[in-house]
UniProtKB/Swiss-Prot annotation:
Keywords: Cell cycle, Cell division, GTP-binding, Magnesium, Metal-binding, Nucleotide-binding, Septation. Pfam families: MMR_HSR1. Mg(2+) binds at S46, T68. Gene3D superfamilies: P-loop containing nucleotide triphosphate hydrolases. GTP binds at residues 39-46, 66-70, 84-87, 151-154, 184-186. GO terms for cellular component: cytosol. CDD domains: YihA_EngB. GO terms for biological process: division septum assembly. GO terms for molecular function: GTP binding; metal ion binding. This is Probable GTP-binding protein EngB. Its cofactor is Mg(2+). The lineage of its organism: Bacteria, Pseudomonadati, Pseudomonadota, Gammaproteobacteria, Alteromonadales. Belongs to the TRAFAC class TrmE-Era-EngA-EngB-Septin-like GTPase superfamily. EngB GTPase family. It comes from the Bacteria.
């Protein structure tokens, strides 16, 4: 069957949940396709989501890193969702709360069967911090593809930007095809077509294609 193009501008807020256990209570089971967005609290995750969906306030931006504690879910259609995970690595938050959030992130990556890809967002000026690597390792260990998205690329000159992109690609080369690395600017739109192409591919995992093919053949 022909792969359809997903219109990410149609994303709409579905639910918020405090952790993965509560997420299961709100969603129609561990079904469909989910793409998760994860990153440090200052990585520009909300701005990236808003830019990719062309909606100024789909994901709330905050001047206070770590304020967004909830898992926020946005619906693309009846089978596909975007999941905005809590920011990690924030400084002005109690240690117990940090540990709780990081545990929830790990549980989500390891237990959510419908997860077809994870976007790990990193400020291009400060990539590959310990928690970024942990998120990437968790995802790849669960055989979930990762897009390492280097945000705020407009902050660097072209030569410095490509130097950092190449350095990050080299650092993540051992993960093979499981990890892609791309620069991105929510402000300038740099990298947006490439990112949307990757997300669209993740929205059509092989199991879903097989399921839809079977449904077509039975009609």
């Amino acid at each position: 069957m022909t792969e359809s193009h997903i219109d990410f501008r149609r994303a709409k807020f579905l639910i918020s949940a405090p952790d993965i256990a509560h997420l299961d209570q709100y969603l129609p089971g561990d079904v469909g396709v989910e793409i998760a967005f994860a990153g440090r609290s200052n990585a520009g995750k909300s701005s990236a989501l808003n830019a990719l969906t062309e909606q100024k306030s789909l994901a709330r931006t905050s001047k206070t890193p770590g304020r967004t504690q909830l898992i926020n879910v946005f619906e693309l259609d009846s089978q596909r969702r975007l999941v905005d995970l809590p920011g990690y690595g924030f400084a002005q938050v109690p240690l117990a709360m940090k540990n709780k959030w990081q545990q929830a992130l790990g549980e989500y990556l390891q237990k959510r069967a419908c997860l077809s890809g994870v976007v790990v967002l990193m400020d291009i000026r400060h990539p590959l911090k310990d928690l970024d690597m942990q998120m990437i390792e968790w995802a790849v260990a669960s055989e979930i593809p990762v897009l390492a998205l280097l945000t705020k690329s407009d902050k660097l000159a072209q030569s410095a930007k490509m130097k950092t992109v190449n350095e990050v690609r080299k650092a993540l080369a051992d993960f093979g095809d499981w990890v892609l690395v791309e620069p991105f600017s929510a402000l300038k739109g740099t990298g947006k077509p490439k990112v949307l192409s990757i997300l669209n591919e993740w929205c059509h995992p092989q199991w879903l294609r097989d399921e839809l093919d079977t449904a077509e053949q039975s009609n």
